[in-house]
Amino acid sequence: MFSESTLYDQDTFYRAFMRDLLHSKDEVIIQSPFITEKRMRTLLPIFSKQRSRNVRIVINTRNPNEHDGDYYYQALNAIYELQALGVTVLYTAGHHRKLAILDRKVVYEGSLNILSFNDSCEIMRKIASEKAAKKLCAFIAIDRYARSK
């Protein structure tokens, strides 16, 4: 009845997530309201590697105009770099979801901003379930906003 899940905190999340991210074969969907240069320095090389393997990457975030000061410029620059790699970037006003769906088989969801986390107490749950991943894709209506390859 229940899918097996694994819990991570701010200290254990990225090791597991980056391993799974590198093993993704078809598609990566990330929803994260904030994007910072510091986090992107870690993730951009992985995104680049995955794009060279023709892995589809879709990121849903806030429009940079919703950020103030330095966060505006960090988001704007990161989005430019992501788009240069061929990453599809979507904007949702007031966005605050924090999740990732890998190959429509693995879900990560919780409180951690995947593209910006720096220094706070967080929780993320990994669910390895094709059924849960497809249900979440339907719930966030990703196929309506980002066409499949």
Protein language model annotation of sequence segments:
Residues 28, 87-133:
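HKD (HxKxxxxD) catalytic microenvironment of the phospholipase D
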Residues 8, 60-62, 92-94:
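Conserved beta-strand termini and adjacent loop/short-helix elements that scaffold enzyme active sites
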Residues 10-11, 37-40, 89:
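A conditional alpha-helix N-cap/helix-loop micro-motif detector
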Residues 41, 70, 118-122, 145-149:
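A short, polar/proline- and glycine-enriched secondary-structure boundary/capping micro-motif
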Residues 9-17:
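A short, well-structured juxtamembrane/interface segment
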